[in-house]
Regions:
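C-terminal catalytic "cap/lid" subdomain
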Residues: 1-220
Length: 220
C-alpha cells in the first residue's frame, strides 16, 4: 500500500498508513455511494494467490529527469553521490537514480524546482564540479507503480507491462525494481498516462480475475 500511495493512489496519504501499519490494524476501503458492497480489505499478511500476482497499479505525474553522461563515469568514484548532493544542497530531494555504465538519471519532483533559474544553477554546479559530457533535462514525466507480494514468485509480470506499453506505442523512460520484488516502477511521458493505466489494468485485472477476487472478498 505504501508503494501505491507513493505513486498517486489517492485514497490514502502516505503518512496516514503508518499508524495502522505499525499496529497491524486491517483497513477497509468502501465506495461511499455503495457502502453495502464488500470493497477492499487491506491486511498486513495474506495468503498469496499465484494466479493474481499484482495487487494494484497506480500512477503519479509531475516528475523531471536529469540525465548526465560522461565517458568512464563508472570508474569515477563518488560521481553519483556528489551529483545527488548538489541537488540536496539546493533543497531538491532526488527520488530515483537509475544508472547505466556511462550515465545516470536523477529523477526529481518538478514541484521542488522553484524556477528555471533554480534548476539552471544546480546544473551549472554539476557542469563545473563534475565536468560531464552532456546534461539533458526531460519534463512532464509520469511514474507507474505496479505492486504485489506474489510478483516475486511469478515470471512475466514485467514483460506484461512492457508489452502493454509497446502495444500502445508508449516509450519507457525508466524501469526500477527493488530486491524485494514487491513493486516495479515505470516512467513514461505524462501525456500517455491514461491510455497506459487502462492497458495495465486490462493486462493484470481481466474481468474473470475481478469476479474471482470480488467473490473472495464477499466470503470474508
Amino acid at each position: 500500500m505504501r508503494e501505491l500511495s507513493y505513486a498517486g493512489f489517492g485514497i490514502f496519504h502516505e503518512e496516514a498508513l503508518e499508524p495502522v501499519y505499525r499496529n497491524d490494524i486491517p483497513v477497509m476501503i468502501r465506495n461511499t455511494n455503495q457502502p453495502e458492497i464488500a470493497g477492499t480489505k487491506i491486511v498486513s499478511k495474506k495468503e498469496l494467490d499465484p494466479r493474481y500476482p499484482v495487487t494494484g497499479v497506480s500512477s503519479a505525474t509531475g516528475f523531471t529527469a536529469i540525465s548526465i553522461s560522461k565517458y568512464l563515469l563508472n570508474r569515477e568514484m563518488g560521481f553519483m553521490r556528489r551529483a545527488i548532493r548538489f541537488f540536496e544542497e539546493a533543497g531538491v530531494p532526488v527520488e530515483h537514480v537509475p544508472s547505466g555504465i556511462d550515465s545516470i538519471s536523477l529523477v526529481i519532483r518538478s514541484a521542488n524546482i522553484q524556477s528555471p533559474e533554480h534548476l539552471a544553477g544546480i546544473l551549472a554546479t554539476i557542469q563545473d564540479k563534475l565536468n560531464p559530457d552532456s546534461i539533458q533535462v526531460e519534463d512532464d514525466l509520469c511514474i507507474f507503480a505496479i505492486v504485489g507480494e506474489a510478483m516475486r514468485e511469478n515470471v512475466g509480470v514485467a514483460a506484461a507491462a512492457s508489452r502493454t506499453f509497446a502495444e500502445n506505442h508508449i516509450n519507457i523512460r525508466m524501469i526500477s525494481q527493488g530486491a524485494s520484488e514487491i513493486s516495479m516502477l515505470f516512467m513514461i511521458k505524462a501525456e500517455d498516462e491514461d491510455i497506459a493505466l487502462q492497458g495495465l489494468y486490462q493486462a493484470y485485472f481481466p474481468r474473470e480475475a475481478l469476479a474471482t477476487l470480488a467473490a473472495a472478498a464477499q466470503g470474508e
